[in-house]
């Protein structure tokens, strides 16, 4: 049976938010820079350019920028980032970080890293060649 769903209601300021500052520049070489700031405290900027132009397999766009705003709970949010051939790399005080490595594990990792490479233990393919399966009844 069909029942109309309640429509969400939005409260708050419905008046337009002014753009205080806006810039957008594109260069003939493909590099760019843009930025803006709004009347309610949102700000963002980014610049980018082609890295290693003309070098096959190394050519990639690289962008760096930031954005900031105030979260609904009133806390300031600010993110700086780089986006390149290795992915998106954000930094911000509010972003989660991995827990520290426990000292015992760190000592073990340091010990392993300090050991010389052992012959045949470097991933160089020192494995026995696979053998064919015997035919059924040929035992």
UniProtKB/Swiss-Prot annotation:
List the lineage, top down: Eukaryota, Metazoa, Ecdysozoa, Arthropoda, Hexapoda
This protein is called what?
A: Endocuticle structural glycoprotein SgAbd-8
GO molecular function of the protein, one example? structural constituent of chitin-based larval cuticle
Q: What does this protein do?
A: Component of the abdominal endocuticle.
Q: Which organism is it from?
A: Schistocerca gregaria
User: What residues are glycosylation sites in this protein?
Assistant: 14-15, 97
**Residue span of region Disordered:** 111-139
Keywords in UniProt for this one?
Cuticle, Glycoprotein, Pyrrolidone carboxylic acid
Pro residues bias spans: 129-139
Where, per the database record, does this protein carry Pyrrolidone carboxylic acid? 1
